[in-house]
Amino acid sequence: MHQDFQEDEHEYPDIRRNPLHEVTMTSYILGILLGIFVGLFPQIRFKNFNLFIIALSLFHFLEYYITAKYNPLKVHSESFLLNNGKSYMAAHSFAILECLVESFLFPDLKIFSYSLATKLCTVLGCLLVILGQYTRTIAMHTAGHSFSHIVKTKKESDHVLVKTGVYSWSRHPSYLGFFWWAIGTQLLLLNPLSLVIFIFVLWKFFSDRIRVEEKYLIEFFSAEYIEYKNKVGVGIPFI
């Protein structure tokens, strides 16, 4: 048994980068948050906010879980992406603030049954959140060891060009999934201001990030990536 562990130890995450107390507490808090808003679902008038918190909790949990399961050598306590930069925190804080202010000033406008528009936005938001999460999760699973939360400037030994599964119809499916997931959350919250801001900021962010990342991917894989790029789009409009 000890010999088997030694043979497979390269597949296990580095415990020094995964303090168990941090991972355990983060998972516990996300689970509590999800449980609270599932439990409050029948009691809160604006149920869309509950759905948003549930989706947000699941997103951050799955970021760590999928990385740990399918890319264990790269997992670390920051893989939850809770510390995803000041811009990320500011965007969600603004969205929640807008939702709460509008719920106080115009409570009826935040109700699913208020109008056909609120019903359509809610249903479309739910669909985008589900499809976006599914696309990102499957992308991380499919890429396996080749997936990274940060742009790689040097080619690693286990980095291969993945062109199968979701990568056969989008060359950046994890970005595609997050783009539509995030837009879906703002439709779900019925946030007109945040919806416009999210679309603009996310489009600019992914446009710049993909341009930088693909410069390195061309260095790593040369003509193979250029051919792949010419055949497969991204899926985010105008990128």
UniProtKB/Swiss-Prot annotation:
- Compartment annotation: Endoplasmic reticulum membrane
Q: Name one GO cellular component term.
A: endoplasmic reticulum
Q: Which gene encodes it?
A: STE14
Effect on the protein upon substituting L81F: Abolishes function
Binding positions for S-adenosyl-L-methionine per the UniProt entry: H159, V160, L161, V162, Y167, H172, P173, S174, Y175, E213
Q: Pfam families annotated for this entry?
A: ICMT
User: Which keywords describe this protein according to UniProt?
Assistant: Endoplasmic reticulum, Membrane, Methyltransferase, Pheromone response, S-adenosyl-L-methionine, Transferase, Transmembrane, Transmembrane helix
Transmembrane regions listed in the UniProt entry = 24-44, 48-68, 89-109, 111-131
Membrane topology according to the record: Multi-pass membrane protein
Gene3D superfamilies linked to this entry: 1.20.120.1630
Membrane topology (Cytoplasmic): 1-23, 69-88, 132-175, 207-239
Q: Which GO terms describe its molecular function?
A: protein C-terminal S-isoprenylcysteine carboxyl O-methyltransferase activity
Statement: the UniProt record of this protein carries the keyword Phosphoprotein: no
One GO term under biological process is: methylation
Q: What else is known?
A: Present with 2690 molecules/cell in log phase SD medium.
Result when mutating G132R: Abolishes function
Q: Does the keyword Transmembrane helix apply?
A: yes
How does this protein's activity depend on the pH of its environment?
Optimum pH is 7.
Q: State what protein this is by name.
A: Protein-S-isoprenylcysteine O-methyltransferase
As recorded in UniProt, its EC number(s) are 2.1.1.100
State which ranges are Lumenal (membrane side). 45-47, 110
Per the record, the major location class is: endoplasmic reticulum
The enzyme's main class, written as a single word, is transferase
